[in-house]
């Protein structure tokens, strides 16, 4: 007995329906979820009340999240930066800054502070996995 089976599967259609097509819908949703869950961990500016969390950009394809601003890097690293010539945290315009070997103190610590993405993933990584798995039609293990 001979058995012949023919299938007409369109992988691109299946992937696109699950947000995994060339439009990167699942990746964009992942980036938006990470930004939302990182929010309580991102340092908050004192004085002006402005949050650094509002100064981010998600890449058009969802592949990266960039926190903008002249202070974003040292906030993320968590080290006081000083001017190379002045030795002051209030460096002159155009003066290069270097780490001073002292940790920053954060308003809202210990929740808000350095390495906010890593700390969020340590605390809520399972939630991120569940959200993405649900979005693409799967189940988190």
Language model features: what each stretch is:
Residues 1-72, 81-141:
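Short, Lys/Arg-rich flexible segments
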């Amino acid at each position: 007995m001979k058995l012949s089976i023919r299938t007409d599967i369109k992988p691109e259609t299946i992937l696109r329906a699950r947000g995994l097509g060339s439009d990167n819908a699942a990746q964009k949703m992942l980036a938006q979820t990470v930004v939302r869950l990182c929010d309580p961990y991102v340092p908050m500016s004192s004085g002006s009340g402005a949050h650094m969390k509002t100064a981010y950009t998600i890449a058009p394809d969802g592949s990266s999240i960039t926190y903008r601003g002249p202070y974003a890097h040292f906030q993320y690293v968590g080290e006081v930066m000083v001017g190379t010539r002045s030795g002051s945290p209030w460096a002159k315009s155009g003066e290069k800054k270097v780490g001073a070997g002292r940790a920053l103190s954060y308003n809202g610590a210990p929740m808000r502070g350095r390495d906010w993405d890593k700390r969020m993933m340590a605390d809520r990584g399972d939630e991120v996995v569940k959200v993405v798995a649900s979005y693409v039609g799967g189940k988190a293990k």
